[in-house]
Amino acid sequence: MPAYNEEKNIGTVIEQWYPVVERIGGESRLVILNDGSRDGTYEMIRKYQKKYERLIGIDKPNEGHGGTILRGYHYAVDAGADYIFQTDSDGQTLPDEFWQFWKKRK
């Protein structure tokens, strides 16, 4: 999940999406890539990492949305992910919408 200047939203987004990761189980992770935010986005991610062991926060220089998504895909592939689902950190996609994709994965 790419994140840029989402300090005000990222906590809510984590709280919404983390139960999806827990429900899937196994080696599932919620990976958020901070794209060089100038606000407290990464600090918020780190705060939530203390609460959620399956949350991975990655801080990196700004590369823009596309570059950050690509970096996230590379991270997931290198980590051996069987499935990758990408959504943005602005809260526009709701976790309930995920399950229709998950059911079609086979």
Language-model segments: which ranges?
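Structured catalytic core of nucleotide-sugar glycosyltransferases
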Residues: M1-K106
